[in-house]
């Protein structure tokens, strides 16, 4: 994928020398205090002894544990049908595990959609209010800088549109922008760029890598692309591996 050849590094700064993408003071204040960090507690997103079973009795996980440190970019790899999307929803607080716990910087994970963990799903149409314009959706999230929007390739005229007036890729960029505007400590991305062409996918991932590096944001992501994983991940977890 030649699109990756420009500015992507597995380690270090993805765009050295460019303007820095720090959270604005309002964004940092928005995130602060959402989750208290106990003195002496190591900062991390931690799933401990997670088990999950469907109502019919099918067990998806039994005692799964993982940790993600601030600034890490962790790829989750597993065959189709293993339950990667379910795990992403558990990590972001959208699903409650049958057993076990998810902790964020030493405290229980808050309700879904709140800082400090934001989910970027693979179906953006399921994560927006169809009655809102994109400007309205972003205004609810927090500070949205022009650098954030331009970095994701969002055109100004798109902001006045509703979800049904945008393509899937355009809508997904707004979902990514909203997640970042919430000033999360951790991002969970479930095949969130699979709908993009190669050039757009590379651009979005360069931006996400740069954001995470400069803000110390931990990233958990799912992808079936070995090349993308090789360029983005600082660590890979093979789910189901013994």
Regions found by a protein language model. Give the residues of each.
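Conserved structural motif at the start of ABC-family nucleotide-binding domains
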Residues: 45, 60-63
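The feature captures the beta-strand-to-loop junction immediately N-terminal to the Walker
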Residues: 77-79
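Helix-to-loop junction immediately C-terminal to a conserved catalytic motif
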Residues: 92
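Conserved ABC transporter NBD signature motif
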Residues: 100-113
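Q-loop/switch helix immediately C-terminal to the Walker
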Residues: 123, 130-145
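Conserved ABC ATPase signature
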Residues: 162-166, 170
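Hydrophobic anchor residue at the start of the ABC signature
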Residues: 176
């Amino acid at each position: 994928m030649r699109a990756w050849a420009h500015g992507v590094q597995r380690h270090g700064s993805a765009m050295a020398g460019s303007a820095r993408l720090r959270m604005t003071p309002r964004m940092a204040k928005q995130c602060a205090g959402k989750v208290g960090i106990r003195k002496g507690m190591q900062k991390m997103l931690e799933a401990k002894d997670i088990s999950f079973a469907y109502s019919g009795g099918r067990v998806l996980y039994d005692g799964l544990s993982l940790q993600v440190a601030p600034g890490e970019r962790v790829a989750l790899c597993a065959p189709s049908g293993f339950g990667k999307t379910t795990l992403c929803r558990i990590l972001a607080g959208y699903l409650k595990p049958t057993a076990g716990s998810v902790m964020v910087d030493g405290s229980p994970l808050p309700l879904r959609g709140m800082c400090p963990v934001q989910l970027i799903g693979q179906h953006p149409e399921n994560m927006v209010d169809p009655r809102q314009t994109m400007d309205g959706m972003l205004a609810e999230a927090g500070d949205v800088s022009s650098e954030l929007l331009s970095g994701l390739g969002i055109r100004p005229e798109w902001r006045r549109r509703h979800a049904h007036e945008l393509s899937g890729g355009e809508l997904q960029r707004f979902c990514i922008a909203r997640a970042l505007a919430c000033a999360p400590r951790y991002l969970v991305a479930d095949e969130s760029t699979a709908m993009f062409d190669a050039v757009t996918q590379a651009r979005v991932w360069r931006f996400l890598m740069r954001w995470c590096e400069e803000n110390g944001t931990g990233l958990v992501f799912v992808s079936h692309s070995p090349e993308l994983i090789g360029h983005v991940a600082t660590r890979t977890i093979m789910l189901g591996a013994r």
